Amino acid sequence: MSTPTSFTFNIAYSVPINKDPSQPTLTLEEFWRGLHRGSEKPQLFAEYVADTEVLPNSKSANEFQRKLIMANGAVHTAKGVELLQDVRNADGLLDDGPDALYLTAVYELHVPDVEPGSERAKEIEREYAQLALGAARTVVETIRRWKVEGGLEDA
């Protein structure tokens, strides 16, 4: 009897929140409100998420956990798959001003039936790295757009 193989890929990206001085500046509070809004309505960030539930097990106002239910179009994750995602704003951050704000997104991808080190695994690493970086940038751009449009007041 053979053992099923599974490929696991971990990646993290940090993107500046206020990179472009010509764009409206986001404060930490505004960005956190935007993350909450997107967590309750993930389709606003990504069409490949069908639904979400913010779980009631938060330990503080600076963190929450949500369950995502994937839709069609998710890379390497089938429709209907449920994922748990932890979201937190690190405690004890020093406020060095808006230029010092970053979003760090950490992803862990599990892909069954792919051999670690195989060509398919390397292809997934390349594709998922691009997707993860793009997702982090999209979150920042979307929250900034909500601020400009007045949508953060609804969050």
Curated annotation (Swiss-Prot):
Effect of disrupting the coding gene: Impairs the production of acetylaranotin and accumulates chemically stable intermediate cyclo-L-phe-L-phe or shunt products such as 2-hydroxy-2'-ene-cyclo-L-Phe-L-Phe and 2-imino-10'-hydroxy-cyclo-L-Phe-L-Phe.
Pathway: Mycotoxin biosynthesis
InterPro entries to which the protein is assigned, alphabetical: AtaL, START-like_dom_sf
Superkingdom to which the source organism belongs: Eukaryota
Role according to the record: Nonribosomal peptide synthetase; part of the gene cluster that mediates the biosynthesis of acetylaranotin, a member of the epipolythiodioxopiperazine (ETP) class of toxins characterized by a disulfide-bridged cyclic dipeptide. The first step of acetylaranotin biosynthesis is performed by the NRPS ataP which produces diketopiperazine cyclo-L-Phe-L-Phe via the condensation of 2 phenylalanines (L-Phe). The ataC domain of ataTC then catalyzes the formation of bishydroxylation of cyclo-L-Phe-L-Phe.
Stated name of the protein: Acetylaranotin biosynthesis cluster protein L
Organism listed in the record: Aspergillus terreus (strain NIH 2624 / FGSC A1156)
